[in-house]
Amino acid sequence: MTDVMYNPEIISKAGVILSSCFIDKKVDYVITVETKGIPLAYEVARNLGVQLVIARRAAQVTEGPTVTINYVSGTSGRLQQMSLSKKSMKPTSRSIFIDDFMKGGGTALGIKELLKEFNSDLVGIGVLVDNKQVAKKLVDEYVSIVELKAVKESSVIDIRPSKMFTKK
């Protein structure tokens, strides 16, 4: 996944695709969680002409006062933390969450809860890869570019274009 996430040509194109899904949402911020999702989120923010905000797994002293929440990982069920500087966002803003990979949706749900602390709305979720091996997600509405259907023992990965590319 790292070879894809840090390839500027691929991420630039993926950023165009995802930003086109949210162009009419009147977004104030693109938010992501450190670290692998940052290049994709940056491209989406750049295309939409809005600020990128990065939530951290642990608060950094250099960021000043922060808001920290606990959330449950959608796949492992483990309790995790997410922090965001109080200066990162204006209240009553509208944000989209962009990430590299969605397993169970726990991180997306955590972002939604974190944004509530800023009186801000999560108006969309976009990911590069949606892991379809996890059937029940903690979030219902999101877009993905590709779907991971299966990883076989022989290291063969079954990845297909997401439903946004298939005719209905």
Regions found by a protein language model. Give the residues of each.
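PRPP-associated nucleotide enzymes
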Residues: 1-98, 102-168
